[in-house]
C-alpha cells in the first residue's frame, strides 16, 4: 500500500483513490486488537507533502518528521540504525524500515517528501484497516463500512486519529475532480518512457497523471507528473519488471550524484562494497546513485567513493591500511590485497598451558577442563633426548571431588629426573636442590618471586608460576610439530584430533582422554556434572562481580579487548571462583592469565593488579614488583655465573625482583654488588607428601594434615593369584609398592611409571598386566578402550572417519575414503564450527554460515549458505528464521516449516528427504563437495560436508582446516580477537547494525532459570549416560538452559526440546542412539499420520476412514546395525528392523547385527533406553597350521 504526490493512494488490494487532508490518519494497522502488531500513521502539511510519520511496532515507536528520525526512549538516530529487530537504512533515494521478528515481518519506506509505502505479510489479509483498506483481495469493497459504501471523505474521516491535544476538523467534502481526457495520451506516453512492457496496470496511473497535470500551477506541465511516474517506476520495479532511465536533467531530476557514482532508475539496493563485494539479496531495484559496473563502494576509508576491487583498503583493529600495506602478527605476516588480508603462516613455537587448577590448553589451542588426582603424561616426544617425558602431578586441594589442582611438574629422562613444585626442586634421589640448578643441557632458575623457568638446549622451555596458583606453561620449538603426545596434544595444527589417547584413538571427552595418559595406577578423572556456581547464589554473585572486571568497559583490561577476547577468561574466572574454597587466589590467577596472554601479544597491562585489592603483590627484602622483569642482573649468583639465570622468555614475566643495581642474596634481600655472598651447600629437610605406615594404616601429609587410608587387617589375603601383595613397610624389591603396578593402560603409554608416594596393594606377577576388570593378562591380550567401553583383541570399531582394530592394547586406525565434518546452528544463536569452535551471538541480520571461493583472488563460489536471524525473545536473543542455500543459479529457501526451490544448476545434484521432524538435503557438487543439510523446521540447522578439493571455506562455520585456533577468521581474512568482531564481519547485509554484546537471558528472566535447569538436567541424567563418555554434555546443557530462559514469547517448551534434540543428535553422530522422548516430555505424535491423510496438493491433512498403524516415532534407524544414510530421529513407517531406502523408495532390512561390543565397565552404566549405533566388527585370524 502506498501514497504519493498531493494525495494519491493505492490500497493493499490495488484500489487507487485520491484524498487530501492535513489531519493525522491511520495509514495501516491491525484491526480489532488492543495491542496491534503494527500501527502506522501519517500527516500531510499544507504543502501536501508528508510532514510526519508515526510507526508503532509493539513497544517500539519511530517518528519521522522534518528530515529527522527519532525512536522513543532513544532520541534522534543516525542511519543506518538497528535495534530490537528494527533496521532503518537508506534505500536508494528513499529510507526503508524493516521490522523482522519471529512472528512478523513488515517493510515501511518513505522519501522524506510525498511518498510512503507499507509492505506486509499475507497472514494479515482481511485483518487490516486504515487508509490502506481491509486487504481482503477485493479492491471494490475497501470503502465499505457496516455494509455501506462510503465516499472517499467519509472513509478517510473514519481513519482520522487526533493527537492527544488537538481536535482536527475533517476537511470539507468537495466534488472529486474529473481528469481531463486531453492529457490521457501524454500520460500514457510518459508512463511508457518509464517501462513500456511493465505488467502493472496503467489505467489508474494514467488517471493520477491526468489529475497531476490539470492541478499543476501551470496546467499541462509534464514536471507535475513526476511523483506519479516515480510511483509507477517503483511498482514496476517491485514486480521485477524492466525499468528504463527515464529521468533527464530537465525532467524529474533528483539531483547530481556525489563523488563518482552514477544515477540508475533501477539499481540494486544490495550495495557491493569493499567489505562485501559479493553481497546479494532478494530486494527489488530502486532509483538512486550507484557505483558503475566493475566497481564497489569503498566503505572502509572515509571518502566512500567507488573504486575497483584492487583499490580496496583493509582494516584491522580500527586502523585502515592501503592496498599493498603489510602487517605482522603472531606467527604470520599479511598483505592487504583487494580489501582482504593475504596472510602467510610463519614458523611458530607451540605453547601448552596448565592454568586455574583444572584447565589445559593444548599446542593446537584446544582448551578443556578435567578433575583428576594422579600423575599424567603432559608431553612425550621423540624429539626429546634420552627418552625425555614431561609429566604433571594433580592433587586434591579441597573437600569436593572437583577441587583438584596442579601441584608439580616432572621432567624424566634416562639421564635426569626433575620435580618442580611450589618453590622447590627435587632431583633423582628425592634430593632437594637450591635454585639455580644445572644438569647438562637443562638449567632451572627463578625468574622472579612468582616464576621458575626451565631452559633447555633442545627446544623445550618450561615456565612455572608458583603463586597465587601453581600453573605451568610449556613452549616447544617448531621441530616438535607432529611429534608430541599427551595432555598437550599432538601439535599437528589440527585441533579436532587433540584428544588422541595413548591407545591411538581420538576420544570425545576430556576425562577419558586424560585417563589414557595416567602415569600411575590412579582412579579415573571425574566429571563436574553441575555448575559449581549453582550451589550458592552468593558465591555466584561474588564470582561474577569480581570477574566482570575482565569484560567491563573503562577498566585496565579494556585496552586489550581488541587483541584478546576476554569472554573465555571471564568464564574460567567465574568457574574457578565458585569451584575452589580459596576464592581470591583463583580469581587473581584467572585475571593474571588474561594479562599474560595480552603481554604475549605485545600489550603489557600495567597496574592491573591495583584494580583488585586481593591481587596486589607485596615484595620482601626491599624487592620491587614489575610486570616485566627477569632474574638476569638481579641476583648475586647471576654475577658469577650468568649462564644459570640469564635466559630471557619471549613473554614478559611479572613478580618481585631487586631494583636495578641491586642483587638478591641468600637471605632474599637486595644488596649492592659489593655485599653479595657465596652460597653454601643445600640444606637437608624432610620432603612433604612422605608416607608412614602404622598397623596397616597408611597416612600421608597433605596440605599440613594427615590423610589416612586402610584398615587393620592382613591385606595379602585380598590378592588372588597370579597377583601378589607388596607392602610399603617391608618391601625390598619395590619401594613404591603398588603405585607402579603394571597395567594395560600404562603399557599403552609406553613409558615407565613415575611414582610420587608408596602404596601397598596387589600387583600382577612379572610379565602380566592388569586389565580394566582387574585380571592379569599377557600384553598381547590387553584390551583397548574407547568411549568408556572396553574392546578385546582383534575387535574393530568404526568412528566417523576411521576404522580401528585393537592390537596389543592399542588402536590401529585406517582413514575412511570419505570423512565429513559438521557445523551446527541451533537454538538462540549457538554455533559449533566445522573444527569444533563453539560460540553464541545475538545478531539480527542475515549472516553467511558457509561458502567457498574465499581465496584472495576471489574465485566464484559454488555454494553459499545464509541464515536470517531475528529477535525471538524479550531479552533480545535471536534465532534463525530462515536458511537460504545458493548453488549457482539454484536457490533453496527454508522457512515456515517448508522449503522452496527456484532456478536451475545442471552441475549440481541434489535430492530431498522429508520427515515429520526434519528436512534433509543431499547435495553433490562434482569434484568439490558432498553435503548433507539437515533442518528441523524450526531453529536448528546442520551442515555435514566432505570435500574432494582443498578449496577454502569461510563464514560463521569457520574455515574447515582442522584447527579451531583460527576459526574466527573474518571476511577480510584476519583472525578476530573475539566472536562478535568475527560475526559482524560476516553480515550479508552491510546495513545491519553490529552486535556489541551477548545477552544473558537467565539474568534478564531469573524466574525461568530454575525451570530451565530442571528440564535441561535430562542431559546430565541416566537417560543420556551412555553418551556422556562420547560427547561432552556440558556445552549442550548450558545452551539448553540459556535457550529455555530466553524463549519467552511463545514456544518455550519447543525451544527446550530443540536444545535437547541437538545433544541427542550429537550422540547419534557418535553411534549412540538415545530414546529420550516420552508422551509427557517433548512428545512427537507420529501416530497422527496413521489416521490422517493429505487431502490434495495443498498439503492439508484430514481424518481418513481407514486406520494404518505403520507410522511411529523412532530415535534412530537400525540401532546397533548398519545404516547407509545420515541417521536422524523421526517418524517412520518401516518396522523396527527396517529402514526406508530413498533410492528404491521402499522399506529395506537393516544389515545383520554385528558382534556385540564388550560391556561397559562398572563405572559406566548402560541405560535401558540406549543402544549403540556404531558398527562393531570382529577381526578373524586364520588358525595356526
UniProtKB/Swiss-Prot annotation:
VWFD domain location: 1-169, 350-534, 821-993
Region spans: Disordered: 1160-1185
Modification after translation, per record: N-glycosylated with N-acetylglucosamine (6.7%), N-acetylgalactosamine (0.6%), galactose (1.8%), mannose (4.6%), N-acetylneuraminic acid (1.0%) and sulfate-containing glycans (0.7%).
Positions in coiled-coil regions: none
Xref: Pfam families: C8, TIL, VWD
Subcellular location(s) of the protein: Secreted
Domain of life: Eukaryota
Keyword line: Disulfide bond, Glycoprotein, Repeat, Secreted
Residues modified by glycosylation: 223, 930
GO BP annotations, alphabetical order: cholesterol homeostasis; intestinal cholesterol absorption; macrophage activation involved in immune response; negative regulation of cell growth
Complex formation: Multimer; disulfide-linked.
Function summary: Ovomucin, the glycoprotein responsible for the gel properties of egg white, is composed for 2 subunits, alpha-ovomucin/MUC5B and beta-ovomucin/MUC6.
Name of the protein in question: Mucin-6
Amino acid at each position: 500500500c502506498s501514497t504519493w504526490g498531493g494525495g494519491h493512494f493505492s490500497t493493499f488490494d490495488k484500489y487507487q483513490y485520491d484524498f487530501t487532508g492535513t489531519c493525522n490518519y491511520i495509514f495501516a494497522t491491525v484491526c480489532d486488537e488492543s495491542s496491534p502488531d503494527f500501527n502506522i500513521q501519517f500527516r500531510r502539511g499544507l504543502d501536501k507533502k508528508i510532514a510526519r510519520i508515526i510507526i508503532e511496532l509493539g513497544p517500539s515507536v519511530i517518528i519521522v518528521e522534518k528530515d529527522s528520525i527519532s525512536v522513543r526512549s532513544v532520541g534522534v538516530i543516525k542511519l543506518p540504525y538497528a535495534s530490537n529487530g528494527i533496521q532503518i537504512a537508506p534505500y536508494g533515494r528513499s529510507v526503508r524500515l524493516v521490522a523482522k521478528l519471529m512472528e512478523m515481518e513488515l517493510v515501511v519506506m518513505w522519501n522524506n517528501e510525498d511518498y510512503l509505502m507499507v509492505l506486509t505479510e499475507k497472514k494479515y489479509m482481511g485483518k487490516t484497516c486504515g487508509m490502506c483498506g481491509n486487504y481482503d483481495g477485493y479492491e471494490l469493497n475497501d470503502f465499505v463500512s457496516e455494509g455501506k459504501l462510503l465516499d472517499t471523505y467519509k472513509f478517510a474521516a473514519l481513519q482520522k486519529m487526533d493527537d492527544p491535544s488537538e481536535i482536527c476538523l475533517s476537511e470539507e467534502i468537495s466534488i472529486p475532480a474529473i481528469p481531463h481526457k486531453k492529457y490521457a495520451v501524454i500520460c500514457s506516453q510518459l508512463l511508457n518512457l518509464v517501462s513500456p512492457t511493465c505488467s502493472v496496470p496503467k489505467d489508474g496511473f494514467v488517471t493520477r497523471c491526468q489529475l497531476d497535470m490539470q492541478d499543476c500551477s501551470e496546467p499541462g506541465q509534464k514536471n507535475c507528473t513526476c511523483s506519479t511516474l516515480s510511483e509507477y517506476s517503483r511498482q514496476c520495479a517491485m514486480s521485477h519488471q524492466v525499468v528504463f532511465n527515464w529521468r533527464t536533467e530537465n525532467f524529474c531530476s533528483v539531483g547530481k550524484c556525489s563523488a563518482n557514482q552514477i544515477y540508475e532508475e533501477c539499481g540494486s539496493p544490495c550495495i557491493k562494497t569493499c567489505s562485501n563485494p559479493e553481497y546479494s539479496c532478494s530486494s527489488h531495484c530502486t532509483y538512486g546513485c550507484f557505483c558503475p559496473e566493475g566497481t564497489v563502494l569503498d566503505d572502509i576509508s572515509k571518502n566512500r567513493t567507488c573504486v575497483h576491487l584492487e583499490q580496496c583498503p583493509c582494516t584491522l583493529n580500527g586502523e585502515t591500511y592501503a592496498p599493498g600495506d603489510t602487517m605482522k602478527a603472531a606467527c604470520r605476516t599479511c598483505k592487504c590485497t583487494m580489501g582482504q588480508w593475504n596472510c602467510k603462516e610463519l614458523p611458530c613455537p607451540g605453547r601448552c598451558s596448565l592454568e586455574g587448577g583444572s584447565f589445559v590448553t593444548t599446542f593446537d589451542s584446544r582448551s578443556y577442563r578435567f578433575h583428576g588426582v594422579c600423575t599424567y603424561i603432559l608431553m612425550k616426544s621423540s624429539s626429546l633426548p634420552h627418552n625425555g617425558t614431561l609429566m604433571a602431578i594433580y592433587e586434591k586441594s579441597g573437600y569436593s571431588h572437583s577441587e583438584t589442582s596442579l601441584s608439580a611438574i616432572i621432567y624424566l629422562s634416562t639421564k635426569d629426573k626433575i620435580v618442580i613444585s611450589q618453590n622447590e626442586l627435587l632431583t633423582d634421589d628425592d634430593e632437594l636442590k637450591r635454585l639455580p640448578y644445572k644438569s647438562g643441557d637443562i638449567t632451572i632458575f627463578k625468574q622472579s618471586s612468582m616464576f621458575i623457568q626451565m631452559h633447555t638446549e633442545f627446544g623445550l622451555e618450561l615456565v612455572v608460576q608458583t603463586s597465587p596458583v601453581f600453573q605451568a606453561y610449556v613452549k616447544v620449538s617448531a621441530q616438535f610439530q607432529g611429534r608430541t603426545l599427551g595432555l598437550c596434544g599432538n601439535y599437528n595444527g589440527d585441533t579436532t584430533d587433540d584428544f588422541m589417547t595413548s591407545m591411538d584413538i581420538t576420544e570425545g571427552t576430556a576425562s577419558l582422554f586424560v585417563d589414557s595418559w595416567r602415569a600411575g595406577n590412579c582412579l579415573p578423572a571425574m566429571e563436574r556434572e553441575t555448575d559449581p556456581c549453582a550451589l550458592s547464589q552468593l558465591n555466584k554473585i561474588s564470582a561474577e562481580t569480581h570477574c566482570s572486571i575482565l569484560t567491563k568497559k573503562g577498566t585496565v583490561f579494556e585496552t586489550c579487548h581488541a587483541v584478546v577476547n576476554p569472554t573465555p577468561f571471564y568464564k574460567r574466572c567465574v568457574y574457578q571462583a565458585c569451584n575452589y574454597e580459596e576464592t581470591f587466589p583463583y580469581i587473581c590467577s584467572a585475571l593474571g592469565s588474561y594479562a599474560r596472554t595480552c603481554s604475549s601479544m605485545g600489550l603489557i597491562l600495567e597496574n592491573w593488579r591495583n584494580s583488585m585489592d586481593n591481587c596486589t603483590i607485596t615484595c620482601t627484602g626491599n624487592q620491587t614488583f614489575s610486570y616485566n622483569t627477569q632474574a638476569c642482573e638481579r641476583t648475586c649468583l647471576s654475577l658469577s655465573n650468568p649462564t644459570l639465570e640469564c635466559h630471557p622468555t619471549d613473554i614478559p614475566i611479572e613478580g618481585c625482583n631487586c631494583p636495578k643495581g641491586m642483587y638478591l642474596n641468600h637471605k632474599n634481600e637486595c644488596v649492592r654488588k659489593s655485599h653479595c655472598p657465596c652460597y653454601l651447600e643445600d640444606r637437608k629437610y624432610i620432603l612433604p607428601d612422605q608416607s608412614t605406615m602404622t598397623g596397616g594404616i597408611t597416612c600421608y601429609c597433605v596440605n599440613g594434615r594427615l590423610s589416612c587410608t586402610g584398615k587393620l587387617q592382613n591385606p595379602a589375603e585380598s590378592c588372588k593369584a597370579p597377583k601378589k601383595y607388596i607392602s610399603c613397610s617391608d618391601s625390598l624389591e619395590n619401594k613404591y609398592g603398588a603405585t607402579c603396578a603394571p597395567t594395560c593402560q600404562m603399557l599403552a603409554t609406553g613409558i615407565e611409571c613415575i611414582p610420587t608416594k608408596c602404596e601397598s596393594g596387589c600387583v600382577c606377577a612379572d610379565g602380566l598386566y592388569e586389565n580394566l576388570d582387574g585380571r592379569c593378562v599377557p600384553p598381547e591380550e590387553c584390551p583397548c578402550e574407547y568411549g568408556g567401553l572396553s574392546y578385546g583383541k582383534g575387535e574393530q570399531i568404526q568412528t566417523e572417519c576411521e576404522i580401528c582394530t585393537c592390537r596389543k592394547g592399542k588402536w590401529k586406525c585406517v582413514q575412511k575414503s570419505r570423512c565429513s565434518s559438521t557445523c551446527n546452528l541451533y537454538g538462540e544463536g549457538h554455533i559449533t564450527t566445522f573444527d569444533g569452535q563453539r560460540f553464541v551471538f545475538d545478531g539480527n541480520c542475515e549472516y553467511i554460515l558457509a561458502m567457498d571461493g574465499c581465496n584472495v583472488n576471489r574465485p566464484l563460489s559454488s555454494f553459499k549458505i545464509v541464515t536470517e536471524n531475528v529477535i525471538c525473545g524479550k531479552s533480545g536473543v535471536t534465532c534463525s528464521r530462515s536458511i537460504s542455500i545458493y548453488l549457482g543459479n539454484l536457490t533453496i529457501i527454508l522457512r515456515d516449516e517448508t522449503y522452496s526451490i527456484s532456478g536451475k544448476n545442471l552441475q549440481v545434484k541434489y535430492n530431498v528427504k522429508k520427515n515429520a521432524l526434519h528436512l534433509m538435503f543431499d547435495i553433490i557438487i562434482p569434484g568439490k563437495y558432498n553435503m548433507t543439510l539437515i533442518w528441523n523446521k524450526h531453529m536448528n540447522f546442520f551442515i555435514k560436508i566432505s570435500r574432494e578439493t582443498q578449496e577454502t571455506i569461510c563464514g560463521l562455520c569457520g574455515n574447515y582446516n582442522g584447527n579451531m585456533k583460527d576459526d574466527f577468521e573474518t571476511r577480510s581474512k584476519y583472525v578476530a580477537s573475539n566472536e562478535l568482531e568475527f560475526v559482524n564481519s560476516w553480515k550479508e547485509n552491510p546495513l545491519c547494525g553490529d552486535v556489541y554484546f551477548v545477552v544473558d537471558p537467565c539474568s534478564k528472566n531469573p524466574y525461568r532459570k530454575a525451570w530451565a535447569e530442571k528440564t535441561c538436567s535430562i542431559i546430565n541424567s541416566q537417560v543420556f549416560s551412555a553418551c556422556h563418555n562420547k560427547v561432552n554434555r556440558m556445552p549442550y546443557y548450558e545452551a539448553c538452559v540459556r535457550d529455555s530462559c530466553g524463549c519467552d514469547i511463545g514456544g518455550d517448551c519447543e525451544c527446550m526440546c530443540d536444545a535437547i534434540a541437538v545433544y541427542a543428535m550429537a550422540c547419534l553422530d557418535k553411534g549412540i542412539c538415545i530414546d529420550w522422548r516420552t508422551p509427557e516430555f517433548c512428545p512427537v505424535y507420529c501416530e497422527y499420520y496413521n489416521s490422517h491423510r493429505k487431502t490434495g496438493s495443498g498439503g492439508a491433512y484430514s481424518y481418513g476412514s481407514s486406520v494404518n498403524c505403520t507410522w511411529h516415532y523412532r530415535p534412530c534407524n537400525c540401532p546397533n546395525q548398519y545404516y547407509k544414510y545420515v541417521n536422524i530421529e523421526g517418524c517412520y513407517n518401516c518396522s523396527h528392523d527396517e529402514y526406508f531406502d530413498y533410492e528404491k523408495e521402499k522399506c529395506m532390512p537393516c544389515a545383520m547385527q554385528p558382534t556385540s561390543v564388550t560391556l561397559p565397565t562398572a563405572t559406566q552404566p548402560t541405560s535401558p533406553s540406549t543402544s549403540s549405533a556404531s558398527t562393531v566388527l570382529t577381526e578373524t585370524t586364520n588358525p595356526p597350521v
